[in-house]
Amino acid sequence: MQIFLSTSPLDEPSAAKHTRSIAHTAYRIGPGSTLLRQNLLQSRGGLLSISDGDTPPISDPAALCAAVKRECSRREYSGVVLDFEKPLRDDYKPFVRQLGEALHAVKRTLFLPESCAGIAPGAVVILCTAISGGSFREYLEGAVKRFGPEHIALDAQRLRMLFPLPCPGGEGTPLSAAELRSLLANSPSVFFSPELCCRYFTFPRQGRTCFVLFDDAGTLKKKLDIAETLGISTAFFMWPEVEDIAGEIGW
């Protein structure tokens, strides 16, 4: 399994102690379809990761694609991650399509969110592992049937979620690392869900039962193992989420 650590310039020195496979989360799209970069060490290799925070309209997708290609060549990046979290805008689509074509021509890989699947044939779709219902294996099996294992990468999010019971809408509340530690300090009985491939426990609060799902090093490794059996060979971790368990996961 090829593991990339998604890392900001500030955190890169600590992440680089564990791997040279870094997705550099230092880029965003600026006015006039420009590529903006934060202060970044003169590192080489890894991936160029572009966020969609405060992105103005992409009026010249060809110019933006050319800028991305130049940066990939200059820093020897092997591919590009489109870290788009907002709903896909129409002006993104020509850029995504042209970037996919441009990177394919120079044998570089484009990783993109599921919302962009189909826009750039041959790109790799990033799937989130933090599911809270159903079967994790069946979730991946369905994706493999849709995209093919060679066109899937995992966004290995470290799940920390609280659900009040009953929870008809299935909407949980994210927990910070400190909040989860505080709840675990009360020594609840913790169980493993083979279906969800994560750990869970319950506790009472204000007359209701609360249900907590969470990942640790063991469950994250198990998710990667399942993915490998299905032919999926790439995964991403957000470095701040796994810094405390990096030695246990191993890369």
Please report, for each region that a protein language model flagged, where it lies by residue.
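Chitinase-like catalytic core of GlcNAc-active glycosidases
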Residues: 1-135
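Conserved, mostly hydrophobic/aromatic
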Residues: 22, 82, 152-154, 227
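A general structural detector for well-ordered alpha-helical segments in enzyme core domains, enriched
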Residues: 64-71, 95-99, 139-143, 171, ...
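A structural motif corresponding to the C-terminal end of an alpha-helix
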Residues: 74-77, 102-110, 143-151, 222-234
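Short catalytic/ligand-binding loop motif for oxyanion handling, primarily in non-cytosolic enzymes
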Residues: 89, 119-120, 161-165, 243-246
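Short acidic, glycine/proline-enriched helix-loop-strand junctions
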Residues: 92, 99-108, 192-200, 204, ...
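Glycan-binding loop/region signatures in secreted carbohydrate-active enzymes
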Residues: 151, 155-223
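Acidic/aromatic/glycine-rich contiguous surface patches that form carbohydrate-binding/processing clefts
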Residues: 223-251
